[in-house]
A protein has these predicted regions:
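Chalcogenol-based redox active-site neighborhoods
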Residues: 1-150
Length: 150
């Protein structure tokens, strides 16, 4: 399946266009909220493994509906070395179908479903993780990519 194309503004103040990354592998991970426990663990884990992802020609981007300002604070606080993309209007979130019903403490509500998409050099989605459990997730994504490119 072809990855939905989108444009956004990144935390590095560049106009992000997915098309500009053809020829590279891409990890797009969608997370609910900056600076919350699970999202911080997941982001820090991807950050720690970033050099290994870069070695195999892979870029990482985190996406949530937080504002660009929130993302900048989050990046600075934890020394995150990759771009975060803001999707306050949920346009990207809806294109990737990661907005849906969630449950927490017996309450049902609509929210962002923690998900990761692995995209190949030609812009094709080659692996999807939905309802991600953050522990060891970044490592699993890296190992999956390494296995796929052997």
């Amino acid at each position: 399946m072809k990855a939905p194309i989108f444009k956004s503004i990144s935390t590095n103040k560049i106009d992000f266009d997915l098309k500009n990354f053809s020829g590279k592998y891409i990890v797009l991970y969608f997370y609910p909220k900056d600076d919350t426990p699970g999202c911080t663990i997941e982001t820090n884990d991807f950050n720690k493994l970033l050099p290994q992802f870069k070695k195999i020609n892979c870029e990482i981007f985190g996406i949530s509906k937080d504002s660009l300002n929130s993302h900048k604070k989050f990046k600075k606080k934890y020394g995150i070395k990759f771009d975060l993309l803001s999707d306050e209007n949920k346009e990207i979130i809806k294109k990737y179908k990661v907005w849906g019903k969630k449950q927490f403490m017996g309450r049902e509500f609509m929210g962002l479903i923690r998900s990761t998409f692995l995209i190949d050099k030609k812009g094709k989605i080659i692996k999807i993780w939905k309802n991600v459990k953050v522990k060891d997730h970044a490592k699993e994504v890296l190992e999956t990519l390494k296995d796929l490119i052997k």
